[in-house]
A protein has these predicted regions:
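The beta1-alpha1 cofactor-binding region of Rossmann-like NAD(H)/NADP(H)-dependent oxidoreductases
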Residues: 39-40, 61-72, 105
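Conserved glycine-rich cofactor-binding loop
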Residues: 14-15
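Residue(s) in the substrate-gating loop at a strand-loop-helix junction
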Residues: 143
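Substrate-binding pocket helix/loop in short-chain dehydrogenase/reductase
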Residues: 98-100, 107-112
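Active-site helix of classical SDR
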Residues: 123, 159
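C-terminal helical subdomain
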Residues: 183-184, 203-250
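Conserved glycine-rich Rossmann-like NAD(P)H-binding loop of the short-chain dehydrogenase/reductase
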Residues: 30-45
Length: 257
């Protein structure tokens, strides 16, 4: 399906998979709405897309955990930006890897508020317009952690299992409306994910990917673009993308020197 001229909203667009998706959709000549919490990074990304791709880009510093801010921002979009064709729900994070009885409740709340509630707030604000127009595509960035669990992944896995369930339920809710619903569920991707999980411990984060070649953010963005470009009668409901060295959450092959 031709994407040129389509309006794409990407959450968590300031880095990693979100930024890679922005570059991919800009290369496909889409109009970009980019939101994230870190304004300086958004401004840098928007400037590069305008310079390198002559892209039409609008951006906003937005925390998807703030329901009122999300509703106000979507409701206040300028006339030319209100018809959002593709929503990429990318904002998400993991905090900590402790067993549940040692977990930090603040970490739990941040994951639940971002990964699940933030996704719900943005989708609730954008979806009515898609349904009214009889066309649109919601692409949720899920995770292999939405299909499997692993030691210490308790609350993060719970949020991603919730996203997987929501994705399937939303596909039923929108059946017959012309709106497609997709979940792209990557395994190990080398972004800031592990650095955030371990609260800035770069050494521990680097160890996650030692001895293997993980996915890149661009690999995931390519999968997202593939889903978005299927013909209107076809929908990729779930796409699980893993590095070749990974067969599951705990089944990973690492090369040893």
């Amino acid at each position: 399906m031709e994407l040129a001229g389509k309006t794409v909203l990407i959450t968590g667009a300031s880095s990693g998979i979100g930024a890679a998706c922005a570059r991919s959709f800009a290369a496909a000549r889409c109009r970009m709405l980019l939101v994230a919490r870190r304004r300086p990074r958004l401004e840098e990304l928007a400037a590069s897309l305008r310079q390198q791709r002559s892209a039409d880009v609008a951006m906003a510093a937005l925390d998807v955990r703030d329901r009122r801010a999300v509703e106000a921002w979507v409701g206040g979009l300028a006339e030319g930006w209100r018809a959002i064709d593709i929503l990429v729900n990318n904002a998400g994070l993991s905090r900590g890897l402790e067993p549940l009885h040692e977990g930090d409740v603040t970490d739990w709340e941040e994951m639940i508020d971002t990964n699940l509630k933030g996704l719900l707030y943005v989708t609730r604000a954008v979806l009515p317009g898609m349904v009214a127009r009889g066309a649109g595509h919601v692409i949720n960035i899920g995770s292999l952690a939405g299909h499997e669990t692993y030691r210490g992944g308790n609350v993060y896995c719970a949020t991603k299992h919730a996203v997987a369930g929501l994705n399937r339920a939303l596909a039923i809710d929108t059946l017959g409306t012309g709106v497609r619903v997709t979940s792209v569920d990557p395994g190990m991707v080398e972004t800031e994910f592990s650095l955030v999980r371990f609260h800035g411990d770069a050494g521990r984060a680097a160890g996650v990917y030692a001895g293997l070649e993980p996915l890149s953010a661009e690999d995931v963005a390519e999968a997202v673009l593939f889903c978005a470009t299927r013909p209107p009668h076809a929908n990729v409901r779930e796409l699980v993308l893993l590095p070749s060295a990974q067969a599951g959450s705990v089944h990973v092959h690492r090369e040893t020197k």
